[in-house]
Amino acid sequence: GWTGSNNPVGDPFYIDYVAHEIGHQFYGFHTMNSCSRSGYNTEVEPGSGSSIMGYAGICPPNVQNSSDAHFNYVNIRDIGGFIKTGYNDYVNYDVGICDNSTNIQNQPPTADAGNDYIIPNSTPFFLTGTSFDADGLESLTYNWSQNDTEEAPSTRSPQADWSQGPLYRSLLP
């Protein structure tokens, strides 16, 4: 990827530009539902998006002016898969493995989002969850990401009667 800024300083530059372009180098694709279509079913954020791989503030309908400093679930999934295997399913490109793995004793944290529910259209909702780190070494934070794509690009904001596509945005923990 490539990009530029007349004012390359601060979080808007480091998150919206640097982290975004590094995300592309690890096969993280765009998450915004407006402006363009990646073709990889990653358009899971409404409007211009709000996470690192979105175009917050760049393409209407804008959700916010700059990206929040976190990757969406679809990017964590895809970038993580590429890091582990050196392969990306979407573009059929294999760079091979060039790392030296080191075993660590730290156990992965667990998360519990509670019961599954089907929420009818246009129904307000509030989500809660818990997390636990067996090693007690980390302060855990989390957020909720919707994982429903729509045929992008869309020029409209989410509508109350939509039955598919991104209907809500993630927020920083």
What are these language model-derived features?
Residues G1-P173:
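Extracellular (secreted or membrane-anchored) zinc-dependent metallopeptidases
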